[in-house]
A protein has these predicted regions:
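Residues on conserved beta-strands of the protein kinase catalytic domain
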Residues: 51-53
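An amphipathic, aromatic/His-enriched active-site/gating alpha helix that lines ligand/cofactor pockets
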Residues: 28-35, 48-49, 58-97, 105
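Active-site-flanking beta-strand signature of metal-NTP-handling nucleotidyl enzymes
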Residues: 1-9
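Short, surface-exposed ligand-recognition loops at beta-strand->loop->(often short) alpha-helix junctions
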Residues: 9-19
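Short, flexible turn/loop "capping" segments at secondary-structure junctions
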Residues: 1-2, 46-49
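Short, solvent-exposed loop/turn elements at beta->coil junctions and helix N-caps
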Residues: 39-45
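Conserved RNP beta-strands of RNA recognition motif
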Residues: 6, 55-57
Length: 107
């Protein structure tokens, strides 16, 4: 499984529930994604200065991840509206992207 992870803080003045509901509108339109999860820092507990929200998107293959990104770029199903919405809700200075995989690889 390939896990594309985004950490971000919501912009000041933006309601967290509004952010999450808008993120779900975007994520629900990614047809090649296996599943996703949105989590929020609990009680400020963390070992380093990571942003408050974490979004994990799971893809069965790198091709599925690439197809999802192509889906956004091609604006299929007017997905760019929700993607732009994501960028409007988060503090751009805090966005961090990661790509993880299950290890060891499955044959």
């Amino acid at each position: 499984m390939n896990v594309y992870t985004i950490y971000a803080d919501v912009k000041e003045g933006i309601d967290a529930r509004t952010f999450v509901s808008n993120m779900k509108l975007f994520l629900d339109k990614l047809p090649t994604m296996h599943t996703y999860r949105i989590t929020r820092m609990k009680l400020g507990f963390r070992s380093m200065d990571l942003p408050e929200f974490r979004i994990d998107m799971e893809f069965n293959s790198m091709q599925a991840l690439d197809d999802a990104m192509s889906h956004v770029v091609a604006n299929v199903d007017d997905i760019e509206t929700e993607h732009v919405g994501f960028n409007q809700w988060v503090d751009a200075e805090t966005i961090q992207h990661f790509l993880y995989r299950d290890y060891p690889d499955q044959p």
